[in-house]
Amino acid sequence: MSRGIIIIGSGFAARQLVKNIRKQDAHVPLTLIAADSMDEYNKPDLSHVISQSQRADDLNRQLAGEFAEQFNLRLFPHTWVADIDADAHVVKSQDKQWQYDKLVLATGAAAFVPPIAGRELMLTLNSQQEYRACETQLRDAQRVLIVGGGLIGSELAMDLCRAGKTVTLMDNAASLLASLMPPEVSSRLQHHLTDMGVHLLLKSQLQKLEKTEAGIRATLVSQHSIEVDAVIAATGLRPETALARRAGVAVNRGVCVDSYLQTSHPDIYAIGDCAEINGQVLPFLQPIQLSAMYLAKNLLGGNAPLKLPAMLVKVKTPELPLHLAGETQRSDLSWQITAESDGMIAKGMSGEGQLRAFVVSEDRMKEAFALLKTLSV
């Protein structure tokens, strides 16, 4: 008798995988185990909850019970997986255990909180649960410090500013989105945030946080300090690899998988923010959707290697939206930038004259798909 497929996790990757499996097989036993409620919500919406005046429960799209009924699943919410016995094909929690034929790790990634004095005062917004824990503080806060000027930090800074808050955005780098693109490309967003009233503290590092009568004092390495009501850590994500490590599965930055999404153990797979696919961690929606399509086939007996095309990454900054694609972080590209009142096109060219990356903003985003077709990958 088939012991079926167990998926650990209940986020976007897990749900996409369930839907793709059920398109091909209505009856294979499917079990999901996760530490949260398993209710569905749209995680990217967390970047806009404050300006939209949304509470955590407003984000719900589908309750866990409805999901289980729709896709014929066994669900175990609020359940921590303690261990995996890979040789025996057994998943263990504190008081239960489940046998499997195939196991999928969809454990996601955790928000990184800088290891400074007072780090417990920092808020994170990487899940509905985390937002629920701090929504009152964030709603009431007038002065907010965001640590980290990457994708999430920039999105949150714009959102909080639109909500009428006094926002300071801090980063070690000399420009925003520094790990994604050069300063001459990100400067348009940087200027726009400044014009909106966001105070930028670039080339700055946080040293400590202290609770005061007036709120929180944030002290920089430079000894400059500011008083705020809330501090948000937007300093990146770390793939959740502890469970894979305990199971004896190879990990690096993420859980190491090949083009078949298979780990170093033949019956254990990984998908989503926790997975490192052939050396790359790709925590974006499109690669996760494609991974789910291919992994569903492979779990049901197929042998289909994942092929990822050139893909768009969308920066959700509504007053100055950006799309980017290709190797935008490469330092050896020559950038051709056309900036006009209706938007910007920035093309990253190789020494051989090939288009290797691009960034488009505002009304010029409509040119993204044509550029995508000419991108060298």
From Swiss-Prot:
Listed GO MF terms: oxidoreductase activity, acting on iron-sulfur proteins as donors, NAD or NADP as acceptor
Compartments (UniProt record): Cytoplasm
Tree of life domain: Bacteria
Top-tier EC class: oxidoreductase
InterPro entries xref list: FAD-bd_OxRdtase, FAD/NAD-bd_sf, FAD/NAD-binding_dom, NO_rdtase_NorW, Rbx-bd
Record-listed E.C. numbers: 1.18.1.-
Catalytic activity: 2 reduced [nitric oxide reductase rubredoxin domain] + NAD(+) + H(+) = 2 oxidized [nitric oxide reductase rubredoxin domain] + NADH
Predominant localisation class: cytoplasm
Pathway assigned to this chain's UniProt record: Nitrogen metabolism; nitric oxide reduction
Entry protein name: Nitric oxide reductase FlRd-NAD(+) reductase
Organism annotation: Salmonella gallinarum (strain 287/91 / NCTC 13346)
Gene: norW
